[in-house]
Structures are given as C-alpha cells and as structure tokens.
Amino acid sequence: MPELPEVEVVRRGLAEHVTGRTVTAVRVHHPRAVRRHEAGPADLTARLLDTTITGTGRRGKYLWLTLGDGADEPLARRESNFALVVHLGMSGQMLLGDVPNANHLRIAALLDDGTTLSFVDQRTFGGWMLADLVTVDGSDVPAPVAHIARDPLDPLFDRDAVVKVLRRKHSEIKRQLLDQTVVSGIGNIYADESLWRAKINGARLASGVSRAKLAELLGAAADVMTDALAQGGTSFDSLYVNVNGESGYFDRSLDAYGREGEPCRRCGAIMRRDKFMNRSSFYCPRCQPRPRV
C-alpha cells in the first residue's frame, strides 16, 4: 500500500497540473470505486461537474483535492467548502493523460484544458468520495480524515506531544507507528526503515522506550520519508506510479525492509524477518535485539 512519500509524490504532481482547472465531465466506470461515497455514483458525478480544483491536501496516506464554485472568480477568491477525497488503497493510481490499461480504469474526469484525470485501480481497494471540510487543530481537512493524526513531515507535527502519547502505550512500538491516530503516514516499509535507523526492535513496548529514543525514532521516520520523497517513493512493482505513470526508486536504498538473509549495512549481521500483525518485520538482530521475554 502506498505510504506517505508515495502519496505526497502524487499530491505534488496533481498540485502542479490540475490546480485551477474546472471539471467538465465525469464518468464512473466501476461502482466499487465510489463505494465510500454513500450517495452513489450519480451524486458524485453531479456534484463534481463544473467545480474548480482550488488546491490539494494530504494527511498521512489520505489525499484530497479541494473544490470550489464560482468559475468566474479569480482562483484565490474562490471558496473551498468540500473536497474530493482519494484513497489509493493497494494499487490506486491518479494519472493524467492516456491510460495504459483501460481494463483497470475506474473513474475519469475531463478538465477544461482537455486533460483527463483518471483513477486506475487494479485491485479496486481504493476510491473517490466527496466530503465536507472541517477545521481540526487550525487546519481544514475532509471530515472522514479528521481522526487521522498529523504526520512527521507536517510543519505542525508536534514531536514532543507524540512522544508523550507513545510513552503511555503498553503495546509494541511498531504497532503504534502503524496506528494512524497516533502518527500518520507510516506503513510497514517505513516503520521497519525508521526502527532500523533508530536501532529499536519493533517488538519492544512503546512505554519501555525512553523519551529521547522515541524522539530519535520520530526523527528517523521524518528523515527516511524525506529521503524516499527525493527518490519518488518506493515501487516494488508497476502498481505505484506518479501522475505521469513513472515509478519511484527508493526500494534500491532500503536498509531493512525485504532484506532477510542479507548483511546489515551497519554491522554486517544477517538480517531477519519475523511475522507481525499479518505482515513481515525486517530487522538486524545485533543492532535491534529483540526484547527479553
């Protein structure tokens, strides 16, 4: 599933190419792609028509386009009171221009400059929905995203406050990193990478990790996702691409995830893999020793 860096790459591409554009036509090719929009495909289509994309937003793994009316008004003066929320799921893609495989095209929106914005999703776990904007902690976010915590790359992310929350959690630190209500944007890949950089085993209880070490871990999470952003995100297959259909290449720089049986880049010990929450955790047994039972 795309994590923060991959979603941010898509957001930046959309911000550059669709901000200020007006939706002139919409077609829903697969109803499952709008299942989260409770009013149904016809309502989503009708409400999207003639709206102007006034901006883009992201909170953790959630992406949205802010929408406004008043096409005759300058963009800066158009009010944005609702948003198109996009969840990429496991394989969702927001593509501009030609779609390489129309079999997986779920939604298409035509913009006033002739560009087509397409939602392509092979596994159909993602989708679009419309939602009102609400104000949470001084920021306007779509209502379904209001419960999602800020992520380590958010300028208003409060590292000290998150450390205090983590210190009260009597469960594994990796479980807490994956909890989007505690800190958002971190999935399995970047959790393992952050834990490796901070030399913490993901099975340790969050409450047993010192405040200083937790702060270091959150800093490592910010660093690794910044590094991933610079390389276009992580692509293990063709399912994650940016708006131009291009894959990222941070997978070549991973230090932990997927490296079972390979030497640790830091100490040379052989990397291991454990099962965790129906996922795999990759770690160095020397740099990140498991907690004693």
From Swiss-Prot:
CDD domains documented for this protein: EcFpg-like_N (cd08966)
Cofactors: Zn(2+)
First and last residues of each zinc finger (FPG-type): 255-289
Binding site for DNA: 104, 123, 169
EC code: 3.2.2.23, 4.2.99.18
Single biological process term from Gene Ontology: base-excision repair
Residues of the active site: 2 (schiff-base intermediate with dna), 3 (proton donor), 61 (proton donor), 279 (proton donor)
Xref: PANTHER family: FORMAMIDOPYRIMIDINE-DNA GLYCOSYLASE
Subunit record text: Monomer.
Role description: Involved in base excision repair of DNA damaged by oxidation or by mutagenic agents. Acts as a DNA glycosylase that recognizes and removes damaged bases. Has a preference for oxidized purines, such as 7,8-dihydro-8-oxoguanine (8-oxoG). Has AP (apurinic/apyrimidinic) lyase activity and introduces nicks in the DNA strand. Cleaves the DNA backbone by beta-delta elimination to generate a single-strand break at the site of the removed base with both 3'- and 5'-phosphates.
Assigned protein family: Belongs to the FPG family.
Protein name: Formamidopyrimidine-DNA glycosylase
Natural source organism: Mycolicibacterium vanbaalenii (strain DSM 7251 / JCM 13017 / BCRC 16820 / KCTC 9966 / NRRL B-24157 / PYR-1) (Mycobacterium vanbaalenii)
Gene for this chain: mutM
